[in-house]
Amino acid sequence: MLIKINSNDIWLPIHFYDETFNFQLVLSIVELFSYLICAYILTLNIYIILKIKMFHRNLYILAIPLFGIWFELIIGKLITIAYRLKILNPGFELGVHIEIWTSDPTRKLKVESVNGLELLIFGGFLQWHYMFTIIFGVLAIAVERVVASVLIENYESNTQLFIPLFLTVISQFLSISTSLALLFQKVGPFLAQLPWIICCPFSAMAYFFVKKCNESFEREIRNPRRRRHFSVSQQFQVKENLRALYLGTRLVFVVLSCIALCGIGITALFYDLIPPFCCHFVENFLFLHPYLSCLTAIFSVPQWKNEFREVSVLGRCLKIGRLKIESENAMEIQDSTKKMGTETDLYFQQLADSWI
């Protein structure tokens, strides 16, 4: 959606559809219910990760906010829903805006001022900020793992927060500045692709460097004839880096799949290959991604998976059902044993009577 205010444009990653109010109301209720379940899974995911610490504190400082920032995205979505249902009413019709970007002036919302649109613009900024926080945040984590591999001699025992704080400040500066540049149309749709085009190759190179470096360390640790001495903390650091790679590989695959589906959907909508209604599915690939990413993270680490089964509602229900089945099976076995004992006693009694 693009808003034209005099000679300035505001670019929002928001869509408004040509749909009846009743349909929008029902759809919004379904979306809100889905977001509530998603929020529960995400909160449980963060709780388990913080409770059972499997990685270095610096990695936690960088990674946990990437999960938690989903709530920022949903705040932006809730603001959009409020405008769609006219709970927040700017005093004029917003119209239909399905395309993510357009150069056609007739397809832009023309207004004289931002009065009544302040929250909508803020919600759009939150969504832009979320997207670029993920992009630059993943690169920051990759850099942190490179540092952990290079400084393997004493990184595990290092308690200073300089590295994660520095990476957080840099990534947030880039995220906020890029989001504002897109929001106020200081860059076009082509330049908007540069952050992920640049970050993805660098993250991939960091991934392969960390993988090769730590696999080499692992082979050296297992070699009984090695000359280099690895302390317990260094051996732990190598194992941690490899665990992080395994987890990161699965998460990146899931996230890239969601991004690819969103990209394909947006392209199909831009060229009118699919009906506008499908845009609901396309944008919810982004809003509902914790269903896949959080469960992938939890089930990639056995300790987290076991804890999830213990504390989650689904896990408790399955546990109660399993205990009930086991109890019923035990009762059946007990009854069967008792019946067999009775039949055996009766048999021997009849056998004894036949000898009389």
UniProtKB/Swiss-Prot annotation:
Any one Pfam family match given in the protein's UniProt record, by short name: Sre
Cited InterPro entries: 7TM_GPCR_serpentine_rcpt_Sre (IPR004151)
Stretches that traverse the bilayer: 29-49, 61-81, 119-139, 161-181, 190-210, 251-271, 281-301
Membrane topology summary: Multi-pass membrane protein
GO cellular component terms attached to this protein's record: membrane
Cellular location(s): Membrane
Keywords: Membrane, Transmembrane, Transmembrane helix
Principal cellular location given in the protein's record: membrane
BP-aspect Gene Ontology terms: sensory perception of chemical stimulus
Protein family according to the UniProt entry: Belongs to the nematode receptor-like protein sre family.
Protein name (database record): Serpentine receptor class epsilon-29
Lineage: Eukaryota, Metazoa, Ecdysozoa, Nematoda, Chromadorea
